[in-house]
Amino acid sequence: MLNDPEIDIVVNLTIPAVHVEVSEAILAAGKHVWTEKPIGVSRDESLRLLQKADAAGLRVGVAPDTVLGPGVQTAKRAIARGDIGRPLFAQTTFQWQGPEIFHPNPAFLYAKGAGPLLDMGPYYVSALVHVFGPVAAVAALGLQGSPTRTVQVGELAGQEFPVEIPSTLSVLMDFEQGGQAQSLYSTDSPLLRTGIVEITGTEGTIVIPDPNTFGGEITITRPLTQAFVPPAPMTQEVVDVVQEGVLSGRGVGLLDMARSIAADRPHVATGEFGYHVLDTLLSIEEAAESRSFVQVASTIDEVGSLDADFDPFEATL
């Protein structure tokens, strides 16, 4: 594959621990790389990857591209045009029992570079950065529900493996351009509550679809317009936001990168965006360890968007 002159972009779907190693091999072969998230497991190796790509005139794209789907992008446009007023804060939740209940070999999901924060956090942090811009500082508390887990399915069922990372994290985020967020990431909860992204502004609260999907229901709840006097029911206006754009699936980010290369313009899910998300997630880990606020060193100048008329099914290449 790396020696095939007809291949311009290679997709890296390896485990997090070798993301950078494999991506560097792809760059060394003279090809652009689209990598699974996170871009790497450390800042140093991830920055090195971006520097090598820049020196070679090659591009790095980083998942998740779910946030480029009509769900998050429609909500982003609604917020940008002032539909909820000035964004103030966000709340996100991802909690469940853990991937060992369905995955035949889940140990890597509890190893360095994964866990609920590094595995699922990229979806939620990416969505928040699309709305609020770059993250300035974070605080967090973490815990480990159990030092080991047990595989539930497949040939390895019954086998125990170690948990190397916090399995629950409670997170606060402060954004450079204003706004705050609180997030919960957990694989210790029997109660399934995932895909919750709510952003409150001065004139309403918008509910965004699960950032691990490409679309879904979008609603805005308006403030009460008259005094609430019990026992009369408290009724609030809930407005549906029409989702704009063509719904497809994974590969949208890769397609945007390929089209952008052909058109000589920036793609949306850049390596720099992926690095800022990683830097934020690693800062959250450090904040949980120190039980303090940690400044996020990286930033990004501009967060790109996909236009509502982006059609992934159009023949353009």
Question: What would you call each of these model-derived segments?
Answer:
Residues 9, 15-67, 82:
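Beta-strand-loop-alpha-helix segment that lines the small-molecule cofactor/substrate pocket
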Residues 1-7:
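A structured beta-alpha segment of the ubiquitous adenosine-cofactor-binding alpha/beta core
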Residues 126-217, 251-267, 281-284, 299-317:
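Contiguous beta-strand/loop segments that form the cofactor/metal-binding neighborhood of enzyme cores
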Residues 242-254:
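Active-site loop of classical SDR/Rossmann-like NAD(P)-dependent oxidoreductases
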Residues 6, 14-15, 185:
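Short glycine-/small-residue-rich Rossmann-like dinucleotide-binding loops
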Residues 66-162, 291:
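Predominantly a Rossmann-like dinucleotide-binding segment in NAD(P)-dependent oxidoreductases
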Residues 8-9, 89:
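Short, Asp-centered acidic motifs that coordinate Mg2+ and/or phosphate
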Residues 239, 260-277:
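Glycine- and charged-residue-rich phosphate/anionic-cofactor binding loop of Rossmann-like
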